[in-house]
């Protein structure tokens, strides 16, 4: 006799995924729709169930509908963000000044370090790699104070370098690249060494072409992480002119709602586009690394 509990229920799975996906996408839909609404339309339509208490009237409830289709459509807030507020673009470039060096630096450091862990034979390499894993699993807040102390010793605690250097030498890229390199058969390296190939030739002409998906995964995950940097910027950057865009958005909390929606859409456009355009490489890169 078959166990009915063991049989799969595709309809139930589909319903669950639809509900879960809707809950995940709803804030994004609200943000995008709100970015094309006027401030008056947002104040009129966007709200939640509000319960208030008055001594004379008692409990009162107010319901305001949530409108997800802009009516009328307005681009005024985008013009306000991109044209009338030059500081927004300055802070956007500040985010790029942090994100791009960390992304490319972490990629280069991760590939080179992973090469040494994978192909070279030296004592205690597995123990040292274990230290990498332990550091990778530590929460960011646990290493902020040591990072600040080290940055203060070198006199860079108030500059981008205090954020960029720890990001470049993050163990995550090393871990991901090494796991992918271990999946490549040793026959490739042995044949190359027999033909007289050196380390740089093996790295750039044998390893890198087979690690394209892993390289894309490292770049995407690092870019998104440091595009959304908050804690490091708050601690290290005391000059508002150096702040990234992620800090600017938190200051908009008391501003116009339509302006917040528009700024949020501009802010999330680049990482969302980056992620969607490289989704296949991201999935394949994580699959090759064996990360579950």
Segment roles from a protein language model:
Residues 2-9, 13-292:
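A structural signal for multi-pass alpha-helical bundles of membrane permease subunits
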């Amino acid at each position: 006799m078959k166990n009915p509990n063991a049989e799969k229920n595709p309809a139930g799975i589909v319903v669950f995924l639809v509900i879960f996906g809707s809950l995940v996408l709803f804030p994004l839909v609200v943000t995008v729709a709100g970015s094309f609404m006027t401030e008056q339309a947002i104040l009129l339509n966007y709200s939640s169930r509000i319960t208030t208490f008055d001594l004379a009237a008692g409990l009162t409830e107010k319901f305001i509908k949530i409108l997800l289709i802009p009516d009328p459509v307005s681009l005024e807030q985008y013009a306000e963000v991109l044209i009338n507020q030059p500081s927004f673009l300055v802070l956007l470039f500040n985010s790029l000044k942090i994100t791009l060096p960390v992304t490319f630096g972490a990629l280069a450091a991760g590939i080179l370090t992973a090469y040494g862990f994978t192909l070279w034979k030296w004592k205690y390499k597995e123990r040292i790699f274990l230290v990498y894993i332990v550091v990778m699993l530590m929460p960011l807040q646990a290493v902020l104070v040591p990072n600040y102390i080290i940055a203060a010793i070198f006199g860079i605690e108030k500059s981008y370098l205090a954020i960029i250097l720890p990001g470049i030498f993050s163990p995550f890229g090393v871990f991901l690249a090494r796991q992918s390199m271990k999946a490549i058969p040793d026959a490739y390296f042995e044949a190359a060494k027999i033909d007289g190939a050196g380390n740089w030739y093996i790295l750039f002409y044998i390893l890198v072409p087979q690690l394209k998906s892993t390289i894309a995964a490292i770049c995407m995950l690092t870019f998104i992480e440091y595009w959304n940097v908050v804690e490091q910027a708050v601690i290290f950057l005391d000059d508002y002119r150096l702040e990234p865009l992620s800090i600017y958005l938190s200051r908009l909390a008391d501003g116009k709602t339509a302006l917040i929606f528009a700024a949020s859409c501009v802010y999330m456009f680049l990482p969302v586009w980056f992620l969607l355009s490289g989704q296949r490489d991201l999935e394949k890169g994580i699959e090759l690394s064996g990360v579950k």
